[in-house]
UniProtKB/Swiss-Prot annotation:
Keyword Plastid: no
Active-site residue list: 476 (proton acceptor)
The name this protein goes by in its record: Dihydroxy-acid dehydratase
Assembly notes: Homodimer.
Protein role: Functions in the biosynthesis of branched-chain amino acids. Catalyzes the dehydration of (2R,3R)-2,3-dihydroxy-3-methylpentanoate (2,3-dihydroxy-3-methylvalerate) into 2-oxo-3-methylpentanoate (2-oxo-3-methylvalerate) and of (2R)-2,3-dihydroxy-3-methylbutanoate (2,3-dihydroxyisovalerate) into 2-oxo-3-methylbutanoate (2-oxoisovalerate), the penultimate precursor to L-isoleucine and L-valine, respectively.
Similarity comment: family membership: Belongs to the IlvD/Edd family.
Taxonomic source organism: Synechococcus sp. (strain JA-2-3B'a(2-13)) (Cyanobacteria bacterium Yellowstone B-Prime)
Modified residues (N6-carboxylysine): 128
EC number: 4.2.1.9
One of the Pfam families matching this protein, by short name: ILV_EDD_C
EC category name: lyase
Binding site for [2Fe-2S] cluster: 53, 126, 198
Length: 565
């Protein structure tokens, strides 16, 4: 590939007499005379031993590196960070999770631009790796491909499949006296059997599936198990495809368009994906300069059915979906019914129609993961945008898989996740209550923690169908039940959620997509006059910088919005 038909960015480093010192440094890392005309490709390697999500990524990076060399490129491997949501969940450390999305994006952008690289292959596993990498790709706009680290296989105990969410729910079950300490320990020991990202259609698998649908990852790659050989082969194949994309000068913004983002959102709805996808795709669209709002998610939700019976509210995990035909099977069904844009370009240079040409029109009848079109799990999508006087800018809810999609009840108000969790575990929350967790938003937390511990405790206590929960924080992809997150404006900036008092009646009406506080405008005005913002929880360091810069969740919680206005 030494004779690329397009000018290489790396020539500012590799060509000319003045760059002799630059070349001297490159020779030290393995460049030879004949290598200075080859494309330099960065491999953003999120390998880490702190989480099973990322502990198998080094093998994928090595396979991709070798394949890039064979394809005539010069790979340069660099590290980027990860936070384990599952390990930090319920702790102060979870405040860094969403922050890490920005750190990942900024770090990849910094290295690729700082070293004048010609292409990027990013490999990630845990939740924020995916959007962080894609935000960077959209900003950089050099030929890029994303390689997912792969999903974990399910654990097994007492005749049932387990995921990490099983362990969170077991805590609630134990606290409610529904299981013994021995059973709790058994679930803990069996929930995570090896490498790979959390196994249901939680955030990591949702985002990887969406990237495949968008055309930035290879077909079938998003549902492969991390420990299977086909995942390593997929990393090598991704490298080969990227080398060809560099030749053809196919760039992320050729792929990340309004149409392809609509395709991704349609697939997210069809597979029953995570609420976090809303936040992340708002941020990805912002990075790619593609107009996208919360209302667009609601428009797509209304026309796309849920086709896949996947955890957290369903029965199966991502490896089951892979055996049933994977994301291409879901996409083919959507395409056949006019719910995908088939003319979108993918990183391989093919269109969506071309990629899906040989995929069957309907799923195999000998599986139950993907429902036939005439018999969907739900006739409309599950991620609803709720609005009302409690969320004028909007809020995000999962509205399928709940027995009671409407609830009106007294507010139980908590100004932190920890105080709420303690109340649940000590039996203070009753059927019919509407739990409010506030000051957990992007600025207020800061960091918009995921409320998996409280929601799992509610489920474990047997209250999942009778208790509502709203928050200006987020939810894990493993959350289900009558839960509403991303309430905006958040409490810290004076949103209505800051004015809720203990015992106020709140209505969550999922079918009507309403979130209403039953307090008069006059009383709210009196409360607002008395309200003042709390002192920032952090005044120095990463969280302080984040809180100062971050936007509303309704805009994706981005940190580079209107910086110079």
């Amino acid at each position: 590939m030494a004779n690329s038909p397009f000018p290489l960015r790396s020539q500012v480093v590799t060509q000319g007499v003045q760059r002799s010192p630059n070349r001297a440094m490159l020779r030290a890392v393995g460049f030879r005379d004949e290598d200075f005309g080859k494309p330099i490709v960065g491999i953003a390697n999120a390998h880490s031993t702190l989480t099973p999500c990322n502990m198998g990524i080094q093998t994928l990076a090595e396979r991709a590196e070798a394949a890039l060399r064979t394809a005539g490129c010069m790979p340069q491997v660099f590290g980027t960070i990860t936070i384990s949501d599952g390990i930090s969940m319920g702790t102060e450390g979870m405040k860094y999770s969403l922050v890490s999305r920005e750190v990942i994006a900024d770090s990849i952008e910094t290295v690729v631009n700082g070293q004048s690289m010609d292409g990027l292959l990013a490999i990630g596993g845990c939740d924020k790796n995916m959007p962080g990498a894609m935000i960077a790709m959209a900003r950089l706009n050099v030929p890029s491909i994303f390689v997912y680290g792969g999903t974990i296989k399910p654990g097994h105990y007492n005749g049932r499949d387990l995921t990490i969410v099983s362990a969170f729910e077991a805590v609630g079950e134990f606290s409610a006296g529904r299981i013994s300490e021995e059973e709790l320990l058994a679930v803990e020991r069996h929930a995570c059997p090896g490498a790979g990202s959390c196994g249901g259609m939680y955030t990591a698998n949702t985002m990887s599936s969406a990237f495949e649908a968008m055309g930035m990852s290879l077909p079938y790659s998003s549902t492969m198990a991390a420990e299977d050989e086909e995942k390593a082969e997929s990393a090598a194949q991704s490298a080969k495809v990227l080398a060809e994309a560099i030749k053809a000068n196919i760039r992320p913004r050729d792929i990340i368009t309004r149409k392809s983002i609509e395709n991704a959102i349609s697939v997210i709805m069809a597979v029953g994906g995570s609420t976090n996808a809303v936040l992340h795709f708002l941020a990805i669209a912002h990075a790619a300069e593609v107009p996208l709002t919360l209302d667009d998610f609601e428009t797509i939700r209304a026309r796309v059915p849920v086709l896949c019976d996947l955890k957290p509210s369903g029965r199966f995990v991502a490896t089951d979906l892979h055996r049933a035909g994977g994301i291409p099977q879901v996409m083919k069904m959507l395409l056949n019914h006019g719910l995908l844009h088939g003319d979108c370009l993918t990183i391989s240079g093919q269109t969506i129609v071309e990629v899906l040409r040989d995929v069957p029109d309907e799923p195999s009848p000998d599986q139950e993961v993907i429902r036939p079109w005439h018999s969907p799990l739900y006739p409309q999508g599950h991620l609803a945008i709720l609005k009302g006087n409690l969320a004028p800018e909007g809020a995000v809810a999962k509205i399928t898989g709940v027995k009671n999609p409407q609830i009106t009840g007294p507010a139980r108000v908590f100004d932190s996740e920890e105080s709420c969790l303690q109340a649940i575990l000590s039996g203070q929350i009753r059927a019919g209550d509407v739990v409010v967790i506030r000051y957990e938003g992007p600025k207020g937390g800061p960091g918009m923690r995921e409320m998996l511990s409280p929601t799992s405790a509610i489920i474990g206590a047997g209250l999942g169908d009778s208790v509502g929960l709203i928050t200006d924080g987020r939810f894990s992809g493993g959350t289900y039940g009558m839960v509403v997150g991303h309430v905006a404006p958040e409490a810290y900036v004076g949103g209505t959620i800051a004015l809720v008092e203990e015992g106020d009646l709140i209505t969550i009406d999922a079918p009507a997509r309403q979130l209403h506080l039953h307090v008069s405008e006059e009383e709210l005005a009196r409360r607002r006059a008395r309200w003042s913002p709390p002192e920032p929880r952090y005044k120095r360091g990463t969280l302080a910088k984040y809180a100062k810069l971050v936007s509303s969740s309704s805009l994706g919680a981005v940190t580079d919005l209107n910086l110079w206005d």
